[in-house]
């Protein structure tokens, strides 16, 4: 391996929203069978990677609410890559956090994918994409999506990916109460307790749902033409149990130029979609005081056509 002293890499790690989230059943491995459309947005964390000569993974961040120890997905990703390749390379990693934690925007999953990609380049490993996908899948269900990102169909527990070709340029307003976070595991457990009677076990029926999303998923995202409702099965649970999510959805639904609205992932972040970023910015400017008075953080962004990207 060549001398890499002083080498530094900076990566943009994007958030995602769910444009479709359907819980189909329960798998033998304990995970849920899902049919989803995931879309990256241009709300980014930034990760800086630099070689250290101590053979250690050292993580620092500007976010004081984040664990920086071995249970952090960034550290887990780095250690898994080292174990897989039987190497003892070290790295100093700094995370500049913009994506809210526990928000349904998959910031942690995105950071994990960024770590695999960033260290692969930093350490000059030349690990192929198939291996990166395999490692990502080991770490978490959402993580493989971020390797290529953009907009994708996601099946299985989220690791079976099919790229969609779209040129959507919608604007997005995100709304989240900073004092509220939601456990993904608890949300799925609650959903299972309430709706497991609807679960499918027949493979052919599951494949029919996948095919329907393949055939119609992209067409159903023309919100400006059809004003379609976004399906998120988990919203049924979170909205019922969390008044702030219910209120956020109501506030977004009343925005004058809102095309559609939903909760992202397991929440609690909610979002509204507008025909373009300019319209979204105008709506946020007009309603920023209302959101602030009611205790919500708000962001405006747009769809992002890529996943992890180098700066």
Swiss-Prot record:
It is an enzyme of class 2 (transferase). InterPro entries: GHMP_kinase_C_dom, GHMP_kinase_C_sf, GHMP_kinase_N_dom, IspE, Ribosomal_Su5_D2-typ_SF, Ribsml_uS5_D2-typ_fold_subgr. It comes from the Bacteria. It catalyses: 4-CDP-2-C-methyl-D-erythritol + ATP = 4-CDP-2-C-methyl-D-erythritol 2-phosphate + ADP + H(+). Keywords: ATP-binding, Isoprene biosynthesis, Kinase, Nucleotide-binding, Transferase. ATP binds at residues 100-110. Gene3D superfamilies: 3.30.230.10, GHMP kinase, C-terminal domain. PANTHER family: 4-DIPHOSPHOCYTIDYL-2-C-METHYL-D-ERYTHRITOL KINASE, CHLOROPLASTIC. This is 4-diphosphocytidyl-2-C-methyl-D-erythritol kinase. It comes from Prochlorococcus marinus (strain MIT 9215).
């Amino acid at each position: 391996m060549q001398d890499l002293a002083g080498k530094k890499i900076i990566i943009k790690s994007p958030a995602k929203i769910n444009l479709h989230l359907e819980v189909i059943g329960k798998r033998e491995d304990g995970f849920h069978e899902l049919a989803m459309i995931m879309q990256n947005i241009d709300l980014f964390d930034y990760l800086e990677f630099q070689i250290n000569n101590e053979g250690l993974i050292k993580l620092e961040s500007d976010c004081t609410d984040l664990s920086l120890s071995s249970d952090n997905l960034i550290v887990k990703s780095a250690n898994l890559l080292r174990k897989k390749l039987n190497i003892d390379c070290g790295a100093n990693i700094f995370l500049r956090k913009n994506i809210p934690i526990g928000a349904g925007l998959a910031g942690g999953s995105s950071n994990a994918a960024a770590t695999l990609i960033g260290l692969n380049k930093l350490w000059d490993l030349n690990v192929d994409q198939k291996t990166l996908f395999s490692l990502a899948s080991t770490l978490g269900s959402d993580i493989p999506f971020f390797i290529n990102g953009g907009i994708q169909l996601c099946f299985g527990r989220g690791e079976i990916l099919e790229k969609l070709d779209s040129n959507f340029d919608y604007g997005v307003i995100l709304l989240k109460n900073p004092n509220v976070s939601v456990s993904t595991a608890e949300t799925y457990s609650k959903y299972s307790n309430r709706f497991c009677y609807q679960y499918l076990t027949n493979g052919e029926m599951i494949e029919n749902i996948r095919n329907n999303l393949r055939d119609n998923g992209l067409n159903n995202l023309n919100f400006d033409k059809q004003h379609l409702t976004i399906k998120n099965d988990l919203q049924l649970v979170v909205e019922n149990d969390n008044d702030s999510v219910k209120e956020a959805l109501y506030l977004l639904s009343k925005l004058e130029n809102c095309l559609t609205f939903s909760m992202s992932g397991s929440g609690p972040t909610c979002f509204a979609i507008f025909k373009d970023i300019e319209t979204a910015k105008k709506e946020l400017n007009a309603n920023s005081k209302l959101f602030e008075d009611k205790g919500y953080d708000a962001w405006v962004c747009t769809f992002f056509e890529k996943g992890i990207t180098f700066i």
